[in-house]
């Protein structure tokens, strides 16, 4: 007993550690969110916006005439949907153009190959013997000079999964493979597309050439054509010709297009949601990323239709030129993440940019996640009827949110089912018919609930300014 009394006395004598102030969401807001959730499931605004962008604009590679029309479209759509404020912010970047592309097998087994130039590839015509590598590591391990006068072929088959994790390998082969090939002496580069389909539609995407290297033509083969080329190489020495008409053409300026539903109590504090407005030029950019634009515009619109404005401002951003290097996201972070005051105005941010599959998981993150743990759990509970699981410790910011998250902004992760995303990603098959309207509505409901509750929270989600360089890609 004496020991218990002594222990109690010691504890009373210790200085009290300050309790972490917990961000919470009022019950009235949770009730309103439940109504919004059901309303969003029955609403077709997200579908209509996605259909409009893909039909009226179509492919919209950054810096193109179609990209400029997409900017005008986004401004008009925000206004049509009743956003209080609509404006644009300039984003400048190098302009890359695709004009023509062709490849063929030469010699006794002559036949065409279905390819597409990788974004950032130079134009030119090369022909030579193909040397096949199973993956990027095998190419990097090849002896220096061993590919002199030859064309490197990296034949890695991506595996489909809900979280798309194998894109880490496929994307690296696309972005780093050409430079690795040049270092070994190659005059050209082809890769099995970074995709999980079996259709004769190649997947494009941006590539990079390391400083000091002379770029060479670089292209992706469709999956069936990669299989065909691999079989030919197995039979014996195989020569191919690649002819690309593409390349950089000066600088271009596009725009982040921003719409806001102004907050009633803290209008300078913002919940940021969005998708990217640009697409590659092969398909109509439906799953990548008209869906994200449609989902987040619709979420903002539904919140704006409430009789009472949200406590904080809902800011929806249609980001410029995500595809070629997060230019819109980096420009946004530069303009709106300059200092601690800027960062404190950012309650939290999330981007929809992984197709239109159903959202299956949710989490938030920041420099101080403990303070918002209760609010995050409350949002997760409101999302649970949509089939969304709370996964603490998982996830990360979306691509265009990552630059401002790197500077300290809190982020939310609404994980979309990407099981078939890489069947379509960056291909001519990325078209509206691949989107399930019911799955799209579930996404709209999730973003509406999340954005509204984050805006209504009593407290913040831990945004704290950090003076760091945003990620490059």
Residue positions per predicted region:
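Soluble metallo-hydrolase cores and metallopeptidase-like ectodomains found primarily
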Residues: 30-32, 108-144, 207-286, 298-301, ...
């Amino acid at each position: 007993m004496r020991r218990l009394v002594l222990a109690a006395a010691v504890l009373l004598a210790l200085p009290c550690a300050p309790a972490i102030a917990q961000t919470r969401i009022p019950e009235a807001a949770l009730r309103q969110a439940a109504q919004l959730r059901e309303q969003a499931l029955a609403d077709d605004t997200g579908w209509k916006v996605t259909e409009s962008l893909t039909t009226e604009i179509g492919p919209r590679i950054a810096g193109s005439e179609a990209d400029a029309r997409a900017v005008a479209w986004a401004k008009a759509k925000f206004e049509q949907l009743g956003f209080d404020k609509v404006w644009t912010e300039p984003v400048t970047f190098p302009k890359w153009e695709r004009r023509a592309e062709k490849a063929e097998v030469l010699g006794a087994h002559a036949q065409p190959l279905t390819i597409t130039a990788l974004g950032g590839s130079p134009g030119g015509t090369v022909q030579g013997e193909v040397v096949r590598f199973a993956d990027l590591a095998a190419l990097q391990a090849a002896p220096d000079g061993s590919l002199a006068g030859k064309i490197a072929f990296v034949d890695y088959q991506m595996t489909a999964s809900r979280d798309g994790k194998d894109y880490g390998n496929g994307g690296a082969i696309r972005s780093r493979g050409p430079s690795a090939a040049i270092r070994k002496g190659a005059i050209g580069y082809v890769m099995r597309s970074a995709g999980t389909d079996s259709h004769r539609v190649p997947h494009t995407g941006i590539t990079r050439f390391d400083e000091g290297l002379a770029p060479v033509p670089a292209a992706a083969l469709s999956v069936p054509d990669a299989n065909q080329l691999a079989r030919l190489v197995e039979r014996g020495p195989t020569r191919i010709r690649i002819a690309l008409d593409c390349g950089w053409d000066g600088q271009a300026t596009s725009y982040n297009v921003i719409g806001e539903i102004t907050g009633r109590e803290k209008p300078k504090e913002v919940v940021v949601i969005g998708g990217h407005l640009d697409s590659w030029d092969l398909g109509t950019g439906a799953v990548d990323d008209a869906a994200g634009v449609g989902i987040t515009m619709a979420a903002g619109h539904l919140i704006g239709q409430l009789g009472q404005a949200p406590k904080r401002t809902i800011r929806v951003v249609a980001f410029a030129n995500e595809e070629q290097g997060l230019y819109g996201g980096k420009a946004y972070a530069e303009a709106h993440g300059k200092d601690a005051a800027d960062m404190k105005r950012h309650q939290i941010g999330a981007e929809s940019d992984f197709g239109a599959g159903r959202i299956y998981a949710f989490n938030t993150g920041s420099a101080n996640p403990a303070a918002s743990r209760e609010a995050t759990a409350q949002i997760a509970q409101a999302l649970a009827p949509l089939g969304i699981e709370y996964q603490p410790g998982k996830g990360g910011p979306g691509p265009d949110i990552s630059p401002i998250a790197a500077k300290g902004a809190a982020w939310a992760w609404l994980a979309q089912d990407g099981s078939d995303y890489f069947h379509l990603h960056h291909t001519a098959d990325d078209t509206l018919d691949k989107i399930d309207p019911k799955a799209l509505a579930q996404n709209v409901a999730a973003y509406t609930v999340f954005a509204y509750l984050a805006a209504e929270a009593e407290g913040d989600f831990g945004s704290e300014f950090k003076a760091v360089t945003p990620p490059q890609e």
